[in-house]
């Protein structure tokens, strides 16, 4: 594995962990989590969400991420505008049920470009390619 491939993979994971931390930070400031009488179930969900970035090297990281993202969709719809769509794609699995086909196709294209660059040993900036593909310049 080339240095550029390793760097691209690290950059890809780091980008998504940043989005995850950003979402967690924003969620912490929203009801029901800021309520004085926040139900225990909601506090436990928030604690599980807060613990997720630290679990990135664990085998069940993707599965835990899927479960938590799906729980956001089902139990905390008010948080959906804060949830980066990239995280649904990143964790995959059942999360994909909440993405329209066109959105999935864009993320597939982005992954294909990343894998092609890695296969060819080319440098690849996930953030730059994502911005170009999603029209975020």
What role is predicted for each listed range?
Residues 29, 33, 55-58, 101, ...:
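Intrinsically disordered or highly flexible coil/loop and linker segments, enriched in small
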Residues 16-20, 42-45, 62-66, 89, ...:
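Short amphipathic alpha-helical segments that mediate assembly, nucleic-acid/protein binding
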Residues 47-64:
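N-terminal hydrophobic signal/anchor transmembrane helix of membrane proteins
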Residues 2-51:
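Short terminal alpha-helical segments
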